[in-house]
């Protein structure tokens, strides 16, 4: 339970004022609970959408749900996406890319990434009916948090010095990833059945491609690239869900 609380405190802005004795391996042990953290985030976003759609017509409830996601996560992962795009697409050497990613200022590539992140989410959600908007809002953070555990476990840390990503990358044991996937599949099966597994695997495939791109640039993962992976995974899952719905598979 302490590790779950630690993960909620780390990945969300939910005010849980409980002091936890954090050890060096506490974060790595807690990743098994990341799908549950995703469920909390997704559940909050879905509630905001559902309640607001009862009183507001049109697409504004979708915008409010996206705003809710930004608030509950503190824009934690989208900041990583912006930093990653600024660094990776800077056409510099590895060391300079890592320096750029560490810069708190948002560059052109980062700004474009943020805009397209929200545009893609909005476009996909606006293409779904109310039922599947709620499903997408709930499950996309669950899938993303699940898939990112693979990067934490089977990657090396790109920076020589420490950083937020360093408490996860290369520190996670495989069985904790297995537990995370079991929890994730259990959640997804309740909502959309066995087809969740197919959507999860599609997301894994695209994140593996993303990993190869990052490795070709900086030879490893950082906290920023993990955050970017989370954002990309959510969008990939939403796009896959929309495709399945369009093809009559859901």
From Swiss-Prot:
Family (UniProt): Belongs to the CobS family.
The protein's Enzyme Commission number: 2.7.8.26
Compartments where found: Cell membrane
Biological process per Gene Ontology, one example term: cobalamin biosynthetic process
Pathway: Cofactor biosynthesis; adenosylcobalamin biosynthesis; adenosylcobalamin from cob(II)yrinate a,c-diamide: step 7/7
Protein name according to UniProt: Adenosylcobinamide-GDP ribazoletransferase
Protein's UniProt keywords contain Transferase: yes
Entry cofactors: Mg(2+)
Gene: cobS
Superkingdom field: Bacteria
Top EC class, one word: transferase
GO function terms (MF aspect): adenosylcobinamide-GDP ribazoletransferase activity; cobalamin 5'-phosphate synthase activity
Transmembrane segments annotated in the record for this chain: 31-51, 55-75, 106-126, 133-153, 187-207, 230-250
Catalytic activity: alpha-ribazole + adenosylcob(III)inamide-GDP = adenosylcob(III)alamin + GMP + H(+); alpha-ribazole 5'-phosphate + adenosylcob(III)inamide-GDP = adenosylcob(III)alamin 5'-phosphate + GMP + H(+)
Membrane topology: Multi-pass membrane protein
Function statement: Joins adenosylcobinamide-GDP and alpha-ribazole to generate adenosylcobalamin (Ado-cobalamin). Also synthesizes adenosylcobalamin 5'-phosphate from adenosylcobinamide-GDP and alpha-ribazole 5'-phosphate.
Record key words, sorted: Cell membrane, Cobalamin biosynthesis, Magnesium, Membrane, Transferase, Transmembrane, Transmembrane helix
Cellular component GO terms, alphabetical: plasma membrane
HAMAP family: CobS
